[in-house]
Amino acid sequence: AYPELAAQLESWRKGEVSEDVFSDDEMLAADAPKATRSCGGVVLNRIFAHMPNLFGGSADLGPSNNTELKTSGYFAPDCREGCNIHFGVRELAMACIANGVALYGGLRAYCATFFVFSDYVKPALRLSALMKLPVTYVLTHDSIGVGEDGPTHQPIEQLASLRATPNTYVFRPADQKETAYAYRAALKLNAPSVMALSRQNLPQLEDTCDKAMLGGYILREPKGTPDVILMASGSEVELMYKAADILSVPVSYTHLRAHET
């Protein structure tokens, strides 16, 4: 009776992704410094415009994580069509629910919290990896700097731990474009993905491009054979550019002792 809806449901059950996601330039556009968690909010909502089977939420941190789907309501007994979920402050249960949604099929699940709280999520995330579930974990407030909440909210060892988890893809974008390409790459995976997104504003970089989907690429080609190769991700890419500018300036030390006084 409803062939178009039946075809759409079958496509969702197969885990197919709308090609429109990969040609939507709105998710790439930004002309001012912006935290990549804010960039992620733009990207999620653009994806939802093409994939209404996107389904997820945050552990009571939606406005901070920027993970609310603006054009949908919250899933509830009187709002079965809602694609946002109020998970509450229970990170492990949230991740387990996301796994269940992914296992059922048809819906593309994501969940979110602060990066530092990913330790609560880890057992369920590891099961996502073992079961090859395409759950997206949006982990925000990633930064080497201490924010207004102090060191209790400063992720340090969490990044290394998640990168060491087998069959888990960790994306740490540097700006709007890289955030969009990270989400696009994640949508092609049959495995969990982690979006490590910054707390603070970051500049929009000229050289970032779709090569971000490869995992790593050269941002600035050297004029000759390089003596040093600088590598960075996320919020440190901006600092890497500044370091490269400093290191590329020739300095003559005619009298070293003079610089020590």
Q: What do the predicted segments below correspond to?
A:
Residues M51-P52, K223-V228:
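A short, charged/proline- and glycine-enriched loop
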Residues T254-T261:
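Conserved small/polar residues in nucleotide/adenosyl-binding loops
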